């Protein structure tokens, strides 16, 4: 695999359905020994996760990393708060953006890049119910169009 490309481990599809993503930021994760082993095995769940900025530092909450099977007594707490590694400018930008009401930080993807676990954090605004329905209708229409084009080519 060429340097710079990441191997996708987990994706938060629910976040793209529930939120409209305004901007994304790549952040590193501070992990314990058995956590990275579990992540490499793909045993991570981003579904209920979110990020917050506290005292000038970014933290990731409610991301479940399953205990490593061979970890015995050295295993970690699956739902512990994990620190995100960001530059000060990025943190200040996120602080300014999240002061707006209705804007939150959600994890979108976790991947391994150059041997390090990275998380793609999305600056997100919650969708209303009618927005979700509209998106589903649009996807269904696109699917039908692609199906008819595919059938016409045959």
Curated annotation (Swiss-Prot):
Q: Which UniProt keywords apply?
A: Cytoplasm, RNA-binding
Q: Which superkingdom is the protein from?
A: Bacteria
From the Swiss-Prot or TrEMBL record, state where the protein is found.
Cytoplasm
Mainly localized where?
Answer: cytoplasm
| A Pfam match | SmpB
Q: Which Gene3D superfamilies match?
A: 2.40.280.10
Query: PANTHER family recorded for this chain?
Result: SSRA-BINDING PROTEIN (PTHR30308:SF2), TMRNA-BINDING COMPONENT OF TRANS-TRANSLATION TAGGING COMPLEX (PTHR30308)
Family membership noted in the UniProt record: Belongs to the SmpB family.
What is the annotated role of this protein in its UniProt record?
Required for rescue of stalled ribosomes mediated by trans-translation. Binds to transfer-messenger RNA (tmRNA), required for stable association of tmRNA with ribosomes. tmRNA and SmpB together mimic tRNA shape, replacing the anticodon stem-loop with SmpB. tmRNA is encoded by the ssrA gene; the 2 termini fold to resemble tRNA(Ala) and it encodes a 'tag peptide', a short internal open reading frame. During trans-translation Ala-aminoacylated tmRNA acts like a tRNA, entering the A-site of stalled ribosomes, displacing the stalled mRNA.
Protein name stated in the entry: SsrA-binding protein
Which gene name belongs to this protein?
smpB
